[in-house]
UniProtKB/Swiss-Prot annotation:
Pfam families: DXP_redisom_C, DXP_reductoisom, DXPR_C. Its cofactor is Mg(2+); Mn(2+). The gene is dxr. This is 1-deoxy-D-xylulose 5-phosphate reductoisomerase. Its EC number is 1.1.1.267. The lineage of its organism: Bacteria, Pseudomonadati, Pseudomonadota, Betaproteobacteria, Burkholderiales. One of its GO terms (biological process) is isopentenyl diphosphate biosynthetic process, methylerythritol 4-phosphate pathway involved in terpenoid biosynthetic process. Pathway: Isoprenoid biosynthesis; isopentenyl diphosphate biosynthesis via DXP pathway; isopentenyl diphosphate from 1-deoxy-D-xylulose 5-phosphate: step 1/6. 1-deoxy-D-xylulose 5-phosphate binds at K125, S151, E152, S179, H202, S215, N220, K221, E224. It catalyses: 2-C-methyl-D-erythritol 4-phosphate + NADP(+) = 1-deoxy-D-xylulose 5-phosphate + NADPH + H(+). It comes from Ralstonia pickettii (strain 12J). NADPH binds at T10, G11, S12, I13, Q38, N124, E126, G208. HAMAP family: DXP_reductoisom.
Length: 396
């Protein structure tokens, strides 16, 4: 019986993870569930899964959970804050950790799981984007197992040589596919008028609002390029992005002999989650087998960097190295939140990120303190740019 901690249990990945878990009560139990503020939803999950720990982002949210559960809280340690998150991730009674907290907030608990030598199901790409070599060094030092949950990286992992799932060994190219999001064919000069609801309406995937906006700008793909660089040791010149509107081929690996291996499946996150939970075995995930006749044509196109400047910015940050990816991620988090609050236009997200990268000091990312200092500096610069250079939009 695998005992699981779910970091970010009330989000989209958390939902999908627990859906797979409830299909296999003989294989998995839940040790800990965490959420930022959704005490109501976490209470429902606590009643169903009876975790040993439940962690929320604030003391007020933890109190709300206690009130919600009442006498049903017996046997559940309810706590709050960053240290409690790290404890839930590293606890000796936990075997595996689903790292599904969105953004920079997920870095410390994910690293805590790595340092405890856990099986880490990595859905929090920002942990690798921000800390890169520090993260991978910790994986090697502490003997952790990291299984990528992003559909693209999960596909790459499945297509690489299984003895050593790394670049080399006859691998010549790694191709990450992208749907192109909801604005792939929209007139570029109309993108300034995009609303948050439009940006969050992904044509293929069900995702949270932040990652949906990242998909619409293709920053999500840019962050995934950086993640692939670190996870698989791929030189940047061997990383390629292709738009594949059907979201059926999740990524591809090209080999020196001309072979290209691809992983296909319906666009449902339960597939990579089930793969990560059961690896190296396979379990039922509730996802129907792909019907290629019904799917029909599979098409591909190169990304238009005029339409998707955030993708180019991510490649720039990867090539710059050091703390540049952390600054990129921080500025993007600030910009996306401002867009969702209707403080800036959709097209200003890239402007915020580009200005921040240009004005933020880039230094070697040789410690977590350095990484978080770069994160803080970039957030401050992004907010300054928004306050002084972005259009002041009328309230919705």
């Amino acid at each position: 019986m695998m005992r699981l901690t779910v970091l970010g249990a009330t989000g989209s990945i958390g939902d999908s993870t627990l859906d797979v878990v409830r299909r296999h009560p003989d294989k998995y139990s839940v040790f800990a569930l965490t959420a930022n503020a959704q005490a109501d939803k976490l209470a429902v999950l606590c009643r169903e899964f009876r975790p040993k720990m439940a962690v929320l982002g604030s003391a007020a949210a933890a109190d709300a959970l206690r009130d919600q559960l009442g006498t049903e809280a017996a046997g559940i340690e309810i706590c709050s804050g960053t240290k409690a998150l790290e404890e839930a991730a590293a606890h000796p009674d936990c075997d595996a950790v689903m790292a599904a907290i969105v953004g920079a907030a997920g870095l410390r608990p994910t690293l805590a799981a790595v340092r405890a030598g856990k099986r880490v199901l990595l859905a929090n790409k920002e942990a690798l984007v921000m800390s890169g070599a520090l993260f991978m060094d910790a994986v090697r030092e502490h003997g952790a197992t990291v299984l990528p949950i992003d559909s693209e990286h999960n596909a790459i992992f499945q297509c690489l040589p299984q003895q050593v799932p790394q670049f080399g060994r006859g691998v010549s190219r790694i191709v990450l596919t992208a749907s192109g999001g909801p604005f792939r064919t929209r007139a570029v000069d109309s993108l300034a008028d995009v609303t948050p609801d439009q940006a969050c309406a992904h044509p293929n995937w069900v995702m949270g609002r932040k990652i949906s906006v990242d998909s619409a700008t293709m920053m999500n793909k840019g962050l995934e390029v950086i993640e692939a660089y670190w996870l698989f040791g791929v030189p940047v010149e061997h990383l390629e992005v292709l738009i594949h509107p059907q979201s059926v081929i999740h990524s591809m690996v090209g080999y020196d002999d001309g072979s290209v291996l691809a992983q296909l499946g319906n666009p449902d996150m339960r597939t990579p989650i089930a793969y990560g939970l059961a690896y190296p075995e396979r379990i039922e995930a509730g996802v129907p087998l792909l019907d290629l006749v019904t799917t029909g044509a599979l098409t591909f196109e190169a990304p238009d960097l005029r339409r998707f400047p955030c993708l180019a910015l991510a490649f720039d940050a990867l090539r710059a190295g050091g703390t540049a990816p952390a600054a990129l991620n921080a500025a993007n988090e600030v910009a996306v939140e401002a867009f969702l609050q209707r403080r800036i236009r959709f097209t200003e997200i890239a402007a915020v990120v580009g200005d921040t990268l240009a004005r933020t000091s880039i230094v070697p990312a040789d410690s977590l303190d350095t990484v978080f200092a770069a994160d803080a500096q970039a957030r401050q610069q992004a907010e300054r740019y928004i306050a002084t250079a972005c259009a002041q939009l009328p309230a919705a």
